[in-house]
A protein has these predicted regions:
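Catalytic metal-binding/acid-base residues of hydrolase active sites
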Residues: 24, 74, 96-98, 125
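Divalent metal-coordination and catalytic microenvironments
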Residues: 18, 72, 91, 119, ...
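Active-site metal-binding motif and surrounding structural segment of the metallo-beta-lactamase
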Residues: 1-4, 84-92
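Core dinuclear metal-dependent hydrolase active-site scaffold
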Residues: 5-84, 156-172
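Alpha-helical scaffolding within the catalytic cores
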Residues: 75-79, 102-109
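Binuclear metal-ion centers of metallo-dependent hydrolases, dominated by the metallo-beta-lactamase
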Residues: 2-10, 107-172
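Acidic-and-aromatic substrate-binding clefts and catalytic sites of carbohydrate-active enzymes
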Residues: 97-102, 128-131
Length: 172
């Protein structure tokens, strides 16, 4: 089942409050994903379909943890709201570059706008780790070095657990 929460709205599911927040990037649908006749005309016209506004999410868990999921975004003054209204203690920040924040921009958003206690690096569009370690020279490493708070790296088979203050009980 799907539950609709439009941009700016909130819903509660299973005790978790989910708010939709602004993300900033284009959000087109490539004609290859559309019906044949429509796709043909769109390709000929050089246009893509509009998939609606980009969004991020703020989750408030039953243990009190507030987590910000950036979605694909660029730097925006709206990131201030994540700190001032929602007071997020954990962030999952996409750092893909090219069509989202790169490492420097993502670090700015975290250090100067959102200011969480911890951040999880996400969606870097690269193999950011090898054998469980951050790859030297990667975007993931650049973000980790620039961020002023602990950056947790998601690894296959590893579970991370955060308390209400955004502190990870992770074995690093």
């Amino acid at each position: 089942d799907a539950v609709l929460a439009r941009l700016g709205g909130s819903v509660t599911l299973g005790g978790v409050r989910i708010a939709t927040v602004t993300a900033l990037h284009s959000n087109g649908v490539d004609p290859d994903y559309l019906a044949a006749d429509l796709a043909k005309h769109m390709k000929e016209g050089g246009i893509a379909g509009d998939a609606g506004p980009a969004t991020g999410f703020v989750l408030r868990f039953s243990n009190g943890l507030v987590a910000y999921l950036s979605g694909d975004t660029g730097v925006s003054a709206d990131h201030e709201v994540i700190r001032t209204l929602y007071q997020a203690k954990l962030a999952v920040m996409n750092i893909g570059d090219g069509f989202t924040t790169g490492p420097a921009e993502a670090a700015y958003v975290m250090n100067d706008q959102v200011r969480p206690a911890s951040v999880i690096a996400s969606h870097a569009n690269e193999a950011g780790t090898v054998n469980g370690k951050v790859r030297p020279g990667s975007k993931t490493e650049a973000f980790q070095k620039a961020a002023k708070m602990p950056v947790h790296i998601p690894l296959s088979g590893r579970t991370m657990e955060f308390d209400a203050a955004g502190k990870c009980g992770c074995a690093e």
